[in-house]
Amino acid sequence: MPKKGKGKPAFSRRRIATGLQVGSYVRVADNSGAKLVKIIGVPGYKGRLRRIPPAGIGDLVVVTVKKGTPEMRKQVVKAVIVRQKRPFRRPDGTWVAFEDNAVAIVTPEGTPKGSEIRGPIAKEVAERWPQLANIATIVV
């Protein structure tokens, strides 16, 4: 008897090289009040036991605010990775790498908390998160 195959996911997303992981400290690119955050989780990651979950451009992550306004500090919030230092390859063959690692804080529903994103964001983020693209200054 043939083995039963796994069903295809509802959406197909090319896996981008993961440049960050749980424990990474990342700059905040928006004006939500947070300045520096630490990644503490990657929702939806299913991996091997004790493997540190990785995250890349466009991924939703759970972060804790380390530096920022007194109202934002010590809060656990969700964020989307908009820039990463590690180079990743696009389908057209070009390689993209940013100067820093950065996230944008979002609500649990996925709407951005800030009203502007400073610096460039990746095209992959703009395609996956249209609301972030609306408040971004530059899309690369």
UniProtKB/Swiss-Prot annotation:
Keywords: Ribonucleoprotein, Ribosomal protein, RNA-binding, rRNA-binding
One GO MF term: structural constituent of ribosome
One protein family per Pfam: Ribosomal_L14
SMART domains documented for this protein: Ribosomal_L14
Cellular-component GO terms for this entry: cytosolic large ribosomal subunit
A GO BP entry: translation
Transmembrane segments: none
Role summary: Binds to 23S rRNA. Forms part of two intersubunit bridges in the 70S ribosome.
Protein family according to the UniProt entry: Belongs to the universal ribosomal protein uL14 family.
SUBUNIT field: Part of the 50S ribosomal subunit. Forms a cluster with proteins L3 and L24e, part of which may contact the 16S rRNA in 2 intersubunit bridges.
Name recorded for this polypeptide: Large ribosomal subunit protein uL14
Source organism (scientific name): Staphylothermus marinus (strain ATCC 43588 / DSM 3639 / JCM 9404 / F1)
